[in-house]
Amino acid sequence: MRIAVVSDTHLSAPSDWLERAYAQHLATADAVIHCGDMTGRSAWSYFLQHPCFHCVQGNMDDYQLAVDLPPRLDLELEGLKVAVCHGWGYKAGLSRRIYEAFGPDYDIIFFGHTHAREDSQFGKTRCINPGSLREGSLAIVTLDAGKISTEFVTL
């Protein structure tokens, strides 16, 4: 399974660069996961064209969008237990705080907020931040027979 993971789009409406990124990297993914801070409903609606799109609310999403998005998601993908959240507070140590808040039962926790790429491991749990799509970063995460591989893409 090939998952395109994005975060921190910070767009009120789709843009040319978003449409290019979608066509080149997201459209062909088996799933698209957005870790929050989409910001506007029109941008969110653009992502809905993907048949397997998941999104959580971020701290910068406008109210009209945020009320329709969950603060976190729990998914099962390819037999792996996956959580998705945006993140909170200071950037330093965020992945550890998220891991401690969610607990050790997850195989993967996808998060955003810091605009910085990260692929950390705590026990059996991988904490993956794709960086900011607005700043030209996303992650392609491949799940294959219980193995997790991450490729960071610069747009």
Show where each model-derived region lies:
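N-terminal active-site segment of His-dependent metallophosphoesterases
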Residues: 1-53, 61-70
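Active-site neighborhood of phospho(di)ester-bond hydrolases with catalytic His/Asp-centered motifs
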Residues: 5-7, 31-37, 54-59, 84-86, ...
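Binuclear metal-dependent phosphoesterase catalytic core
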Residues: 6, 77-78, 101-106, 121-122, ...
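Active-site environment of divalent metal-dependent phosphoester hydrolases
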Residues: 11-14, 39-43, 60-66, 89-94, ...
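Charged helix-capping and loop-helix junction motifs
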Residues: 18-20, 68-72, 93, 98-102
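Short secondary-structure boundary/capping segments
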Residues: 23, 45, 73-74, 100-101, ...
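Helix-adjacent hinge/juxtasegments
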Residues: 52-90
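Mid-chain, well-packed structural core segment of small domains
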Residues: 78-111
